[in-house]
Regions:
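Short flexible loop/turn segments that cap and initiate beta-strands
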Residues: 177-180, 210-215, 607-609, 615-617, ...
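An acidic-aromatic loop/edge-strand motif
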Residues: 6-8, 20-43, 94, 103-164, ...
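Extended acidic/polar, glycine-enriched regions
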Residues: 107-109, 170-241, 645-646
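Active-site-adjacent substrate/metal-binding segments within catalytic domains
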Residues: 32-59, 63-72, 76-83, 89, ...
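Accessory beta-strand-rich segments of carbohydrate-active enzymes
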Residues: 3-15, 43-149, 174-176, 298, ...
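Substrate-binding clefts and catalytic carboxylate motifs of secreted carbohydrate-active enzymes
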Residues: 4-15, 75, 123, 357-359, ...
Length: 767
């Protein structure tokens, strides 16, 4: 199969707009956001829409005896594919890929037209920002009439001593053909083998977290000495083992240090581009995380490719809802007719990725439970399908507060906080709001007898018991369910240190995935602190969840420092925030602290809180040279509260009564606009605009408009980490937030120049 770039020069139409775009493309970024926007708080007040993508292309006459397939990597949602005005395929789910054979619909030797319509008019249909359109791009495969079935090629490492590979390489042909497989370590062929299936011993290096070694597999479909078709892929050799004594990667016990990760790429919207996925995974990897959960939908191919290459493990998740709606128009409408098709699509996509280690069948579902026969039937069918077609285990993110609906209603008197009101004081039973009112009480509810009763049969079917916000069950289930292998599918950032200690104490708990690794679009304000007027559901112009160990641009919060200390990536760090006794914390945002000691003049004399994160048992904090005393580090951190004064703070870490390390944060002096290239890949370059003083300290008080112009490059995204903004991510300007904003550009010339300007200065950057 020849893979052709098919992402350029698509005509994009919506209402009265018609422009040329390159894929991947997020159509939702072209929609208006406004107070009362129909996507609501989940979709960041965007609007829905109907979109048409059209591409014309010449098919040479010599291709008449070829097979041609279109691969749509992701279209949100309800897509239809037309070839020369003939409808040839329809697809409902917005997060699974699909293949369309074009062969018999094409006019050879002539210009052809592919049209893909995407219908996202019925909103809200997601609890978070979904994006829309052809947001993951497309591919075109051209092969002979005899060709490999590329989606069915399966490689599996069955042992490491020696490395033994099980392989199946199916093809389509009316006659028997030969299959040649070559395995390359960079440019060197280390193994050749003939045969379409079997077992093979290989002298190679295993893939693991510290050395994610990948090999290139090249497949040749042969008719005697003639090559009929070719295909290649990357693969790494590794084994998985799950026991009540822990999870073993290549025979080595490995605790999953995980983070939940939404599919959007921040200022890029929902667009999945390889460089964008690498950039955010670098952030998590460098902080000590070794795993992600694709919350709450199948991961993109680009994300999995990046995980393979960086050495990050993946829990790939199927869906956020089954039979019951969480939003009015969500996928619960179509799930029952498509769940096996969707699961197959996810598993086919994942099979040859060494990073993928388990499948989650859903998140916080109202089914299956002991009381829900239909949901329980579906659960068994899905698990059976996995067991018949894959070696990976099944799990599910179970939130014990989300009992079967009759159970939920029965407990409304017991849990008054379940009554959540909109701004018009109407009682709402949206589950996302209900569990928010439970907040920290979810761990307690998980231990209730009712929770055990309605979940016990579900966990008997699943290979791994996935617990959302249920760390208090770890001790309980080590006694009453010693046979269970447990994974913390979703946990609070603030519990990361304590949960890591629990995982070391209870080996049957194999890992933990915090909510979330990086802030994301939609579900606005879930992590925002609130006053008496606005709690969980924040009003327009909120656009971000305001959660995550890292903000939307990748800057660390205090929660990131707690993770870094927990996982051995930091020894001593400082963060601070302005103290406000009237604010109420969100359960999904433990601290508002940042790595700064720069505040406006009107904060002088008001209380701030400084957090010290450290591996050292004792720390001491100094403010402008004056000691505030020594304190014990408990669960990775301690805090100091005092009136703010400009200058500097210094923390010293002590061990055995000796000073081992110090860390200093200083207030920024007069600052000016600066620019730096943060990441530059084959497709994207990320540039940060920051206000810094002469000592390279970011002035986090600066909120200025930055305008950009480009020569030789295209703007892909621009924005800040501000959770409450009306800035548009596809315009040529943005406000800084905490002294910074970021742009992503795609170079379309050998050299490109980007200009960034504020009201005083202009900076040129050449890439």
């Amino acid at each position: 199969m020849i893979l052709k770039d098919f992402n350029s020069n698509w005509k994009f139409e919506k209402e009265n707009e018609c422009i040329l775009v390159d894929l991947p493309h997020d159509a939702m970024l072209h929609e208006k956001r406004y107070l009362g926007g129909p996507c609501g708080v989940g979709g960041a007040y965007f609007s829905g829409g109907f979109y048409t993508y059209t591409k014309s292309f010449m098919v040479p006459k010599e291709f008449i005896n070829h097979s041609i397939h279109l691969h749509v990597l992701g279209a949100y949602r309800n897509s239809l594919v037309y070839v020369n005005n003939q409808e040839v395929y329809s697809h409902k789910y917005g997060y699974t890929d699909y293949f369309v054979e074009l062969t018999k619909y094409l006019n050879y030797g002539k210009t052809n037209e592919i049209k893909i319509t995407v219908d996202n008019t019925l909103v809200p249909n997601s609890r978070w920002y979904s994006g829309a359109g052809l947001y993951r791009g497309v591919e075109l495969y051209i092969g002979g009439m005899d060709h490999f079935n590329i989606n069915d090629i399966k490689l599996n490492t069955v042992s490491l001593d020696p490395i033994t590979l099980s392989y199946t390489i199916p093809y389509t042909s009316r006659k028997k053909l030969d299959v040649l497989m070559e395995i390359y370590d960079e440019d060197k062929c280390i193994k050749k083998n003939k045969g379409a299936s079997g077992m093979l011993n290989i002298d190679a290096t295993p893939w693991d977290l510290d050395n994610p070694k990948l090999y290139t597999f090249k497949f040749y479909l042969m008719d005697k000495d003639e090559i009929i078709d070719t295909y290649s892929l990357e693969y790494g050799f590794r084994t998985l083992e799950y026991t009540t004594k822990g999870f073993y990667l290549n025979g080595k016990k490995t605790i999953l240090k995980g983070a939940c990760l939404h599919h959007d790429n921040g200022i890029l919207g929902a667009k999945s581009i390889y460089d964008a996925e690498v950039k955010r995974l670098f952030i998590l990897k460098n902080a000590g995380f070794n795993a992600i959960r694709s919350a709450h939908n199948p991961a993109s191919q680009h994300l999995l490719k990046a995980c393979d290459r960086l050495g990050i493990l993946v829990m790939d998740e199927l869906v956020d809802m089954w039979l019951y709606h969480k939003t009015e128009y969500d996928y619960a409408t179509d799930f029952k007719d498509n769940y096996i098709k969707d699961l197959k699509s996810m598993m086919d996509k994942d099979y040859n990725h060494p990073s993928v280690i388990m499948y989650s069948l859903g998140n916080e579902l109202a089914s299956p439970t002991t009381l829900d026969k239909e949901g329980f039937r579906i659960l068994n069918e899905l698990c059976d399908y996995i067991h018949k077609n894959d070696y990976r285990p099944s799990t599910m993110g179970v939130n014990f507060t989300n009992l079967e609906r009759e159970e939920l209603n029965a407990h409304k008197e017991r849990y008054k906080m379940m009554e959540v009101y909109t701004n018009s004081d109407e009682i709402v039973d949206d589950y996302n709001k209900i569990v928010t009112r439970f907040g920290y009480g979810m761990a307690e509810i998980a231990c209730a007898p009712d929770s055990e009763r309605v979940s016990i049969d579900t966990f008997k079917v699943l290979d791994l018991a996935g617990y959302n916000y249920a760390y208090k069950r770890y001790d309980l289930d080590s006694k009453i369910h010693p046979e269970r292998i447990i994974v913390g599918t979703e946990t609070m950032c603030e519990d990361i240190y304590k949960n890591y200690e629990r995982m070391k104490k209870y080996p049957q708990v194999i890992g933990d995935f915090i909510w979330t690794g990086i802030d994301y679009l939609g579900e606005v304000g879930i992590g925002g602190y609130f006053d008496h007027d606005h709690h969980f559901q924040k009003p327009y112009p909120w656009i971000l969840a305001n959660g995550g160990a890292f903000d939307l641009l990748g800057y660390p919060t205090g929660e990131a420092y707690l993770a870094m200390v927990t996982y051995g990536k930091a020894t001593l760090e400082l963060a601070s925030y302005i103290y406000d006794e009237d604010e109420t914390k969100s359960a999904w945002r433990w601290t508002n602290s940042r790595n700064t000691y720069t505040y406006k003049d009107d904060v002088i004399g008001k209380d701030i809180v400084v957090e010290v994160y450290s591996i050292y048992p004792i720390v001491e904090l100094f403010v402008n040279g004056k000691s505030l005393g020594k304190k014990e580090i408990v669960n990775g951190f301690t805090t100091y509260k005092f009136p703010y004064e400009k200058g500097s703070i210094k923390a010293i870490g002590y061990k055995d009564n000796k000073a081992f390390e110090e860390k200093i944060l200083s207030s920024a002096n007069e600052s000016k606009l600066t620019a730096r290239i943060d990441y530059s890949g084959k497709e994207l370059t990320y540039i940060y605009f920051e206000y810094k003083d002469r000592n390279n300290i970011i002035d986090t008080t600066k909120e200025e408009i930055i305008k950009v112009s480009l020569d030789g490059a295209t703007l892909v995204g621009i924005g800040s980490a501000n959770p409450r903004t009306e800035d548009n991510y596809i315009k040529n300007e943005a406000h800084t937030f905490l002294g910074a904003c970021m742009i992503a550009v795609k170079r379309n010339a050998a050299h490109a120049t980007i200009k960034g300007s504020d009201s005083k200065d202009t900076i040129d950057i050449t890439i």
